[in-house]
Amino acid sequence: MKRRIFLRNSAFGALGLAGFGLPGFRQIQATAASPDIRITGVETVRFRNAHWMWLRLHTNVGITGTGETYPFNEANTSVIKDLEWHSWAGKLLGTNPLEIEQTWERIFRQNAFHVTGGAEMRALSAINIAQWDIMGQVCQLPLYQLLGGSINKKIRVYNTYTNSRAINGWTLEEDMEKIAEFLVSEGIQAIKFCPFDRVARRNNGEYISWKELEGCLDWIRRIRDAVGYDLDIGCEFHSMWNLPSAIRIAHALEPYHILFLEDMLLQDNMQAYVSLNQESDIPLVISERLASRFGFREMFEAGAGSIAMYDLTWCGGISEGKKISDMANTYYIPTMMHTAGGPILWYASTHLAAAITNLFYVESVYPTWHDRDKLYFKNPPQVNNGHVLPPDLPGLGLQFIDGLFEQEDVIVEKIS
């Protein structure tokens, strides 16, 4: 069925493709229940030098939705193939892409029949993001409107800094002061970095001496000496430490008024986090490594942390991210979004961040949104004076650069 006929039959013809008025509930309900929109093609898109991949869902009405996940893209692609070729509940071909909750539940339950998490959850996250992209295009509304509207007119970001994602070639060891001063000049209010990771790797996370501790704290002092409290500081630990070392580090950081401590321990023992949380005056962030609201439930119930952080391409997608934030809000816990993947994760995170009521920060990485994402899109969300906004276009608002999918380093694989 042609797109024009579909729009007319689904009661959206009167709105027109350029219309942005909010359609009534009956119109949306009629479209979602319509047998006329179906997934007719599933394909993956990989880039030879990228650690992330895309999933594209094509429909019989000419609308294509695009999702994303990362890393381990061979495993992610294999899961999508298995869902499509061998599964008893996960097939996408021929289904209605607007049945977002139904799709999530049947794939999640099939995956949980074997094991929950890993590549299966990453694949489900990509599927969910692609479906929401389709929903927005069908309704001719930006995604944040479908998620409840833009309660956050400006979305506050912090900047994660590593030497592999450097600004102007500056390294943390040599140029900490320049980095801090640059971020402040850009209006960015907080930095996150990993001053303790080198010691954790050397000692396997089992011990940190006072001398080693002082060496790590020097990085913090250099920021304070350069810009004072114009730049908040968050510390990332990559779950490398044991409990006694984490307590020692947390106590040592307290005089420096640190914004948060992220993933000090592995996420598989919330009672250990409860012990750490009782010892630390600094808010604990847990954890983009958790998948689905079921993974976060124990954190909330145990009182293990102060801030919930998730990654939309890992936790189950946009649907699940919204549920995690809403669940956190019942405990008066704010949420943050991890965005260390590809450009579509960045797009999706800005949309959800605009709509949730308990947003703390969204992670940003200056070289990715400022430079990398422009290699793929005409309109990647840009940080302005420390804040970002989602595109005001239907769905995710993706505007691919011309000829992107024909480039030599792009691998497009048709799954079904």
Segment roles from a protein language model:
Residues G62, I127, Q140, I191, ...:
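Conserved, mostly hydrophobic/aromatic
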Residues K154-V274:
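Metal-dependent enolase-superfamily TIM-barrel catalytic cores that perform enediolate-based chemistry
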Residues N60, T64-C139:
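Metal- or metallocofactor-binding catalytic centers and their adjacent structured scaffolds
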Residues G21-L57, T64:
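C-terminal segment of N-terminal export signals and the immediately downstream linker at the start
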Residues H58, H86, T95, Q102, ...:
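Shared catalytic-loop signature of beta/alpha-barrel
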Residues I5-Q27:
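N-terminal export signals
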Residues N128-N168:
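Glycine-rich, aromatic-flanked loop segments that form ligand/cofactor-binding clefts
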